[in-house]
UniProtKB/Swiss-Prot annotation:
GO molecular function: DNA-binding transcription factor activity; sequence-specific DNA binding
Main location: nucleus
Top-rank taxon: Eukaryota
Organism annotation: Oryza sativa subsp. indica
Subunit structure of this chain's protein: Forms homodimers and heterodimers.
InterPro entries per record: TF_TCP_subgr (IPR017887), Transcription_factor_TCP (IPR005333)
Keyword Transcription regulation attached: yes
UniProt region (Disordered), positions on chain: 1-29, 127-163, 282-308
Protein name per the record: Transcription factor PCF6
UniProt keyword annotation of Transcription present: yes
UniProt entry keywords in alphabetical sequence: Activator, Developmental protein, DNA-binding, Nucleus, Transcription, Transcription regulation
Compositionally biased residues, Gly residues: 7-16
């Protein structure tokens, strides 16, 4: 059972409060602490600022903040309500005040409360300012919640997008700067990419240096607009052969520098594949008539080398940036794809002639 001790501040309780202020120990304590009569309003702990109601307000006491409602036992509640009915009061607070006034002589004999216990109680001005400050904060929070809830409309959505876009220019600018810096670095390094030809070729185990490595590769460069040419990277050689490869034709492509094609003027997309200064041929002997006049004997020496049989443990596929010193950077001649096809056609006819003779 609960009995509301302070249901209302008006009504019949005014006289009771006046009596407490003049005589009872509680009134004297209040006067000693606050220095004025009727300062009970300063001891109200209002909860309206936090969303509560006035009837849920609490009070400051010597032992801290306490609730205004008092829980009674069953027997005490029955006696209290019987007394309230006998007094003819419609509010429990009036019956409580009557009881306090009737017990005033006994209350006066009780020891007074320690004024130091009320040192933490704020003054009237501070108590009035705190709810006002809390109320303003609550109003601001409600306005922000309303604005957030009303953002479902198209206008609010547009404003939210504008705020988001306005807060992102710094990030966008930094990302754009990074892109520009990356493109500039790629353009500056285009020549270096062109200088190293991308190739995969055939290696001859057992021979060291450039003489034992017949690393002849195909290099292609593709250029899109003003972007630097994209190609493979010079790779160490890998070797392969198969059992019974004595009569197999040995194909090779000579390694050479990859010349970066000039970027097109209009920013148009241009797919440009260029072959290195090697030629495609079959190792059926030295064909001087089909070989370019500017090919050196060094390349012919490599074309004469035989591939060894494959050992399963020696297969290596290596792709990466090879040192430029391993393969000479000097270009000994350029040959177009048409010339390579013609050279291959000559080898094919030569092979057919040898078969017909046999």
């Amino acid at each position: 059972m609960e009995a509301a001790v302070g249901d209302g501040e008006g009504g019949g309780g005014g006289g009771g409060r006046g009596k407490r202020g003049r005589g009872g120990g509680g009134g004297e304590m209040v006067e000693a602490v606050w220095g004025q009569t009727g300062s009970t309003a300063s001891r109200i702990y209002r909860v309206r600022a936090t969303g509560g109601k006035d009837r849920h307000s609490k009070v400051y006491t010597a032992k801290g903040i306490r609730d205004r409602r008092v829980r009674l036992s069953v027997a005490t509640a029955i006696q209290f309500y019987d007394l309230q009915d006998r007094l003819g009061f419609d509010q429990p607070s009036k019956a409580i005040e009557w009881l306090i006034n009737a017990a005033s002589p006994a209350i006066d004999t009780l020891p007074s409360l320690d004024p130091a216990a009320f040192a933490a109680i704020p003054h009237a001005a501070a108590a009035d300012a705190a709810p006002t400050r809390r109320r303003s904060q609550q109003q601001q929070q409600q306005l922000s919640n309303k604005s957030g809830c009303s953002s479902t409309s198209e206008t609010s959505k547009g404003s939210d997008k504008e705020v988001t876009v306005a807060s992102a220019p710094a990030q966008a600018a930094s990302f754009t700067e990074l892109l520009i810096a990356g493109v500039a670095a790629s353009s500056a390094g285009g020549g270096a990419i062109g200088n190293g030809a991308d190739c995969v070729g055939i290696a001859h185990p057992g021979k060291g240096g450039a003489e034992g490595a017949s690393t002849y590769g195909f290099s292609a460069a593709s250029s899109f607009g003003d972007a630097p040419p994209i190609g493979m990277v010079p790779a160490p050689p890998f070797n392969f052969s198969a059992p019974g490869a004595d009569m197999a034709a040995h194909y090779s492509l000579a390694q050479d520098q990859l010349a970066a094609p000039p970027p097109p003027a209009g920013g148009d997309y241009n797919l440009n594949f260029s072959m290195s200064s090697g030629f495609l041929g079959a190792n059926r002997g030295t064909l001087q008539s089909n070989s370019p006049s500017n090919m050196s004997g060094h390349h012919h020496h490599h074309h004469q080398q035989q591939l060894q049989r494959l050992d399963g443990s020696t297969i290596s596929f290596l792709l990466g940036h090879a040192a430029a010193a391993a393969h000479p950077a000097a270009s000994e001649g350029q040959i177009t794809s048409t010339a390579a096809l013609q050279l291959w056609d000559g080898f094919r006819h030569s092979g057919m002639k040898e078969k017909s003779k046999n």
